[in-house]
Structure formats: C-alpha cells, structure tokens
Amino acid sequence: MGSINNNFNTNNNSNTDLDRDWKTALNIPKKDTRPQTDDVLNTKGNTFEDFYLKRELLMGIFEAGFEKPSPIQEEAIPVAITGRDILARAKNGTGKTAAFVIPTLEKVKPKLNKIQALIMVPTRELALQTSQVVRTLGKHCGISCMVTTGGTNLRDDILRLNETVHILVGTPGRVLDLASRKVADLSDCSLFIMDEADKMLSRDFKTIIEQILSFLPPTHQSLLFSATFPLTVKEFMVKHLHKPYEINLMEELTLKGITQYYAFVEERQKLHCLNTLFSKLQINQAIIFCNSTNRVELLAKKITDLGYSCYYSHARMKQQERNKVFHEFRQGKVRTLVCSDLLTRGIDIQAVNVVINFDFPKTAETYLHRIGRSGRFGHLGLAINLINWNDRFNLYKIEQELGTEIAAIPATIDKSLYVAENDETVPVPFPIEQQSYHQQAIPQQQLPSQQQFAIPPQQHHPQFMVPPSHQQQQAYPPPQMPSQQGYPPQQEHFMAMPPGQSQPQY
C-alpha cells in the first residue's frame, strides 16, 4: 500500500514538474524592447493564462513573441470564447488580428473535419497575412487553415477543400464562388469573422457578404472588427448580430506613437522633397502612397533613377507578382515600397517606421489606414504628407474629422520620435510559408521574370522634376536592419522591381 502511495506521489510530482516546466521548453524569440504607447499598454493587467486557453494554443502564442494581451485582446478574447457576438472598434496596429484568431483557435475542434470558422478580409495580401497568423499561433493545435483569394487557381482550391480544412480565410468573391459550387461546405461553420468590417460592408462587398451568410447555420457566432464604423456596419449589426457585445477603444482615432507632419510643396518639386527626406531620415523601412496605379509605377521608376532600392505594388499587377513583392518587403529585402491604397488595410510590418503620402488622400478614412502602417503595436513611427495648393482643404478637413494635428515639418526631425534605440529588437514578421496549403509549387520557368516587372521607359514628366544638383545625392544612412534578424545589408545594385530569381510561392 505504501509503495502504491509512493508511486502515486512520484507521478503526481512529475506531472506538477511538467506543468511548471512547459514554458521553459518553448522556443521564445528575443524580447522586443522598443518603447510602446498606451495604445497597447493601457490594460487591466491580465495574462493569456488568465483566459484559460488550451496549452497548445498558449505554446503558439508565446513562441510568436506575445507576452501580454493588448487592450483589444483583453476585451475581446474572453467574450468571444463564451460564444457571444462582438462588434469591436480599435485602432489599426493594436492587435486586432490576434484578438479574433486566438478565440477562433480555442473554439475549433481538431477532430471535427469540417470548416468551423470563416474569416473574411477585403484584400489578398491581408488574407495571406491573416492565414499565416492562424498557422503561427495554432501550430501546436493540429488545426488546418486554408487561404483562398481571387487571382489564384480555382482548381487548386477545389482539390484542397477535399482535404480537411478547419479554418477558411478568404476574400468575399472567391468564398462565395466556392460555397455556390458546394465545394466549400459551410453548414457546420459556427464562427463568422469580418476583419476591416467597414470595407467589407461597403458597396463593393455588401451584397456578396449577405449571400455568403445564407450558407452558414442560422445560429452562428459573428465577430466584427474595424477601426471605423460607418452607417453600413450599424445596419448590418441590427440585421445579423444577436445582442452583440460592443467594444470601443477609440478615444482618439490616430495611433499615439505616430508623429504627423506636412510639407507644402509644388507638384513639380515633390520628387526633390522626397529625395531630401531620403537623405535626412533614418529609415528602417518606408511605404510611399500614391493615388493612382500609373503614378505608383512612375514614382518607383524615378526613385530607382535616384539610386534607391524600391519595389512597387498595385491592384493591376498579377497576383503572383503582388505576392512576391509583399513577401520580400515583409522579409526586409528592400527598404522602400511604393503602392496604391491596396496595402492600407491591416498589413502588419513592424519594421516600417516611416509612411509618406506622396499624394495626399481625399478622405479621412484613407488617411487613417495609410498612416497606420507605421507605429504598429504601440511603437513609434513617422507620417509625412506632401501637400500642394489643391490639398490644403483636404488637410484641414482630415484634421477636423480625426481630431488630430498635422504639424508643418521642421528642419530637423528628432530621431527619438521614430527610430528604435536598438534595431535588433525589431521583430521579423512571421515567415510566409513557401507554398500555401492549397496551391501546387510553380516551376522555375513559370516564375515572373525581371522583365515582367520592368517599367517601360518614361519620357520627361514635369511633375517629377529633380534639380541636377540633387541627382547624385547620397542614399539612406547606413542600414539599420540587422542581418541576423533577416534584414540583409543594402544591395549595391538597385532595381524598381523584384529580382527574377526563384522565390517562395504562396
């Protein structure tokens, strides 16, 4: 009898040791020591363990570098786990994606081989990023996630759906197509999530979303997340959500860590001004926004002519090309990305510390989403707006609507406003998997070549003149992105298009 008790006590002690030591065996990344603002620090003091999440999920959370929940995660995760509908409003870059991914992974049953959660996003890039967050946080959970977007092979999606898929991440058009063909069975999908809900319920997508909902069970749970809530979102809430729990963390609309400036310049002097900014600012990575796809390509060509590394991305590019640009910019292989508003929604690249509006946006909503690409997760960032005479009324209107102040740019910008003291702590984004779960590898000869990305020679354009004295100005200061963290030194030969080498496919 004594030996039995001894054995029981020994086993009990060993189990206790295992419970105590499971964290020590995790592969936790280096701590991000950059200063943060109250956007993510103003919490109630809860930890992820306080939510009683399954251990496999906690392992993925900690191995992704998460330490404590942000305010939106603290509010949304426990309520979502109870099964209640949620309407959540929080700033860009405060952890909204994890706020719905974590309860989704907690609620999905790995042994039930059905689609149990549908995550809808407005853009292909955001779908790729969200699916990767699902896979990263849920890597120990035995849960299968599939991403499906327009512009990819429909046959591959159909083949993938013949296998087990627990979580489906996609854009509305492709999801509706698969559901209408009865390829994607949503009859057991008990969780419906919309990220960037304001965009999802705009005229572009509202009808499609309504059709998709008809394929879900009537008792499904709905989670809606966004930074802005126009009237269309409220109408959708009244029609489709059952006694939703409303979260509003928007005391102010802009992130506290972003310092905003404007520079008043003539249109023909914008490139000269941009060149000056490049030489004076300590840029880790920068995103430059234009208002049209033609100006995106033209500006990328002009920046390249000045001797700076530069990629571009816009909606008229092939999906495979956009994927390559997005992947390489996330991995720090180039400092500067010129793009249209394609990348204003939800894209999370924490190494971006400067956003430049080469063309000033027309609406406060667009402005808010653009500048939110810097200062991610409570860190510091810089937003610089190049303003001409015709933009002055929009500048005033946006300041009034957002309740923010955009100051005139000073002669010297304090580096403490946007530069981390130790760039080695800047986290490298989750690596996008070399091949998505539902697409076959593309042979080497089918990859887009450098010529496919090339910009046709441009004639003299009076809007983008650069004084001869500035043509040979020095490029960025010495690279601050540490190579051991996945940010290689700046290359000697610069291009305005991604290299035509074999690259990972999505």
Curated annotation (Swiss-Prot):
Compositional bias annotation for Low complexity: 1-16
Gene: DHH1
Position of sequence motif DEAD box: 195-198
GO biological process per UniProt: cellular response to glucose starvation; cellular response to nitrogen starvation; deadenylation-dependent decapping of nuclear-transcribed mRNA; filamentous growth; invasive filamentous growth; mRNA processing; mRNA transport; negative regulation of translation
Descriptive protein name: ATP-dependent RNA helicase DHH1
PANTHER family membership: DEAD-BOX ATP-DEPENDENT RNA HELICASE 50
GO cellular component: cytoplasm; cytoplasmic side of membrane; cytoplasmic stress granule; P-body
Keywords for the protein's UniProt record, in alphabetical order: ATP-binding, Cytoplasm, Helicase, Hydrolase, mRNA processing, mRNA transport, Nucleotide-binding, RNA-binding, Translation regulation, Transport
Known EC number: 3.6.4.13
Protein source organism: Saccharomyces cerevisiae (strain ATCC 204508 / S288c) (Baker's yeast)
Localization: Cytoplasm, P-body
